[in-house]
Amino acid sequence: MVVLKCPVCNGDVNVPDDALPGEIVEHECGAQLEVYNDHGRLALRLAEQVGEDWGE
């Protein structure tokens, strides 16, 4: 496990060693976080909230 910091509450987030950029993890604070590659190392950012597309 890799321990990263939550960008919302600054708490520790345990991320699996085999996590890939683009994966979503949920933290205790309720934030949905996206794993991304920050210059060769894993980091977390707030996941973009995508609404439903009704084709309108």
Curated annotation (Swiss-Prot):
Residues with PTM 5-glutamyl 2-aminoadipic acid: 56
Family annotation (Pfam families): Zn_ribbon_LysW (PF21344)
Positions of modified residues (5-glutamyl N2-ornithine): 56
5-glutamyl glutamate: modified positions: 56
Zinc finger (TFIIB-type): 1-34
Residues the record lists as binding Zn(2+): 6, 9, 27, 29
Superkingdom: Archaea
Residue interval(s) of motif EDWGE: 50
Record GO biological process: L-arginine biosynthetic process; lysine biosynthetic process via aminoadipic acid
Subunit structure: Monomer.
Matches recorded under NCBIfam families: carrier_LysW_Arch
Miscellaneous note of the record: Binds zinc ions via its zinc finger domain, as shown by X-ray crystallography. In contrast, the absorption spectrum of the ortholog from Thermophilus suggests that it may bind iron ions, possibly via the predicted zinc finger domain.
UniProt protein name: Alpha-aminoadipate/glutamate carrier protein LysW
Organism whose genome encodes this protein: Sulfurisphaera tokodaii (strain DSM 16993 / JCM 10545 / NBRC 100140 / 7)
Upper lineage: Archaea, Thermoproteota, Thermoprotei, Sulfolobales, Sulfolobaceae
The gene coding this protein: lysW
